[in-house]
Amino acid sequence: MRRACFVLALLLMVIGINAQNVGMLKVRELTLSNGMTVWLNEDHSQPKVFGAVVVNAGAKDCPNTGIAHYFEHIMFKGTQEIGTVDYAKEKPWLDSIAACYDLLAATTDDAKRAKIQQDINLLSQKAADYAIPNEFNTLISRYGGSSLNAGTSYDFTFYHNVFTPQYIEQWCRLNSDRFVNPVFRLFQGELETVYEEKNLYSDNIMSTALEKVTAELFGTQPYAYPVIGSTENLKNPKLSDMKAFYEKYYVGSNMGLVLCGDFDAETITPLLEKTFGRLPKGVKPVRGVSPLPDITAERTVEVKLPIPLVSAEALVFKAPTDYDKDANALKVALQMLSNGKAGMLDSLTNEGKMLMSAATTFSLNDAGAAAMIVIPNLLAKTAKAEAASLQQVQRLMAGDFSDESLLVQKQEIYRENARSLETIEERAMTMVEVMSSGHSWREYIENVEAVNSVTKDDVTAVAKRYLSAPFVRFSKKYGKYPKDRLTQPGYKPVVPANRGQESEYAKQLAQIPVREVSPRLIDFDKDASISKLGDEAVLYTVKNPVNELFNLSVKWNRGTLADPRLDAVDALLNNIGTDSLTRQQLGNALQTLGADMSFSVDKSSFSLEVTGIDKNFKPTMQLISHFIGNMKADEKSVKKVVDGAKTNEKSLTESNTDVLKAMLEYAAYGNRASTLHRTTAKEVKAMGGDAMIDAFRKVTSSACDIIYSGSLSNDEVRAIVGNTLPVEQSRQAYVDYSYDPMPYSSPVVYVFNKPDARQTLFFTYEQVSPLTTVQERIPATLFDQYLGGGMSSVMFQEVREFRSMAYSTGSRIMSRSLKRHASSPLAQITIVGTQADKTMGAISLVDSLLRDMPMDEKNFLTARQECVNEIYNEFPSFREIGAEIAAQRRQGYTEDSKTGWSELLRKATADDMRRFYESHIKANASHRALCIVGNKKKLNLKELSKYGKVVFLKEKDLFRK
């Protein structure tokens, strides 16, 4: 324990943690009587708790079957007490379903399989007579929960959400009970949902490519197979195997609990013992390992990607895992090579010799790898770019770097670790990852601290050991992989008979007394110091309670809607130096100060982000001032921007999601859609570097908000910023560049054909007439949540849960500032991702829901509570609060925009929501747009025409090029 305290103290010194806030990093580790590991981290900076249950079982423990991932889905279906009105009567039907699935897995004859599937469908409908859909989610929401989710990786599975602190007893009861007696109910629908998830990954070009890379590297090892499993195995699930998986791995001795946030870590142990201590201890399973096989000889493997023009390759070397004795030295070595600013490989990019040369590492529990990414300039030879990159690796092996640069990179790693622990969610996720790796928090701290002791000899030694070894060269080849097809089985919908019902368990849980707490809202006067620096420049400073690292964000009120060329300007500024500093020299200077600088742009603003150490704030800002005042574009940096624009232009419609986003803009804004005003590659080339810099100069005359979070006082920051940033140039008044969503006089159906899409994406869009007060917008907010905001929403239950028509469903209200644009219309959209052969059924279903919305009082109450929970659980972190205040003030607010919302939400009724629906949505069916991205061969055009005039869109209709 003394050793751990010493190491923690040393780490805190290096990264500048404030002594009075050491508790934020303190993790209390304990073990319950059943062997369950518990990590507690108390942090009162935000009024919420992040809770996660970790199971040391993942895809490597059931390779290629998808069982771990299947079971993750099942864990939301309830228990013998949650999610059922009578488990004793439900159980025989569930047992029969399980037997049928086992029989299905052993049957190959198509006719016999079809008969078994129909039997499963009939049995599932009988079992549904006893099920209460989504009761677990409903109870989580009722007791302050939000962001409910889970994830399966190769090494572990975890279940998590955020909740309001006064409900910690209910959270512990619910999340322990769900693991004691889980029930495999409503499995038919969940099985098809997993099919839909498989479709989603298949349409993602990077996911498919990474699967090929992983399979090539690991061969027959468990890590070789995708987490979700093979299509063939997905079609043949065995519930008996899942039950065996649960009994083996879901035991106290193999599980962990992480709580991080606003609770008392010293007094919570009895509650945890009473709840999570009830899980069976079991025998901690002996898990297999999945090492990366030795790479004995260099080999080249082609990987298909449908990205034109660009050549690319990745050289993958075997490397140690995170806690191996060589891991930290290799981490430093790779940081020396590639850090995004001034590494040895970065120099090749900074000097325009190639589009990218970078190094990275990734680690699983049993295997590690290092990769070097090489992307030559357009039309240049990959072999030449590879040789230049390997030459930089040779420099590293030879020790051709200074002691100062080594120290700088070690400090950079420390800062990255410090930043990863700043907020409740980030820290909790780090705790989950460390716990699942089988190491203690003390070992994690020691491992981070060990970076400080890495020497130059250590770096050169590991570079020679790992980066001179044989590697696998993955070479990009233009093309796409064929997709295996999943077809819908023709099941009848399984609609539970007990929607809106409540189990006896839920009634008992309601007896636990709850302390009423008001939501914490942003106080513009207390949560930030606000001061004017010029006519239209405002400074916001927020105290950093954790460490002595600062963030400075400068947000100018000019984005791509005002000047589409700014996309290219942003790219240029991230790649140039000044009249006296090359990009590499600028990067070195920033790193020496422990700082970083980057530019970004969106539709309404152009931003400069600076991070660093507070003790170096003044020299850092002086360097930024030098860059802003003396930036200089060279021919190579301009060419890099042009090449990037060309590549992007050739890939505008490769991603189905990108096409969907463009269609949404087109549907909502017509010819005003930003994609129709994008700057073409030809125009970028014609601009040249000087014109791009001039465009940035014009940006700095716009209104700007400067947001600082750090340990310096407002007066100190004001003095330094006022002397280093061009705040006096910000004279143009703030402009709101958002547009009103447009109406449709008649229904229309837009279709963008994607012949190889395994999944169809579609959305509905309709304008909603103005809602001019908070009181009018409350029912709209409730309707949006009720329609598609969570697992108890209409879209989730009717489209995904009951009818297995989709994996992704949702809805969203698009609105402008109530203070600035009270008289502006709003818009309502619904979004669905569905298997291609289910498209017409899914469209028909969504249309019927919008025309005749099912009203359920219990689900309304859940939606209302979820809206309240968002207000309670979304108080921003210290890094976010300044930007939130700035944004709200620009939108006309003088106090938190959510002031009074929780009270009004609680008073709202289902009738209020129904009236909004009937007057704004149901009555609007003839003014709706339906937009579809998918394979037109899967569409029935005659049937589709019932929803409006069918218009096929082409690339030129959505993108200017």
PLM regions and their residue ranges:
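Positively charged n-region of N-terminal signal peptides that target proteins for export
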Residues: M1-A4
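Hydrophobic h-region of N-terminal signal peptides that target proteins for export
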Residues: L10-N18
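Proteolytic maturation boundary segments
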Residues: A19-T37, D264-P306, S311-A312, V316-K318, ...
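M16 family metallopeptidases and their MPP-like homologs
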Residues: W39-N41, Q46-D61, I67-Y70, T84-D177, ...
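A common structural junction motif
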Residues: D177-F184, T275-V283, Q391-F401, S625-E635, ...
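Hydrophobic, small-residue-rich alpha-helical packing segments that form membrane-like cores
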Residues: L186-L191, S207-T208, P222-N233, L239, ...
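Short, conserved secondary-structure transition motifs
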Residues: Y195-D203, P291-L305, K410-L421, V610-D614, ...
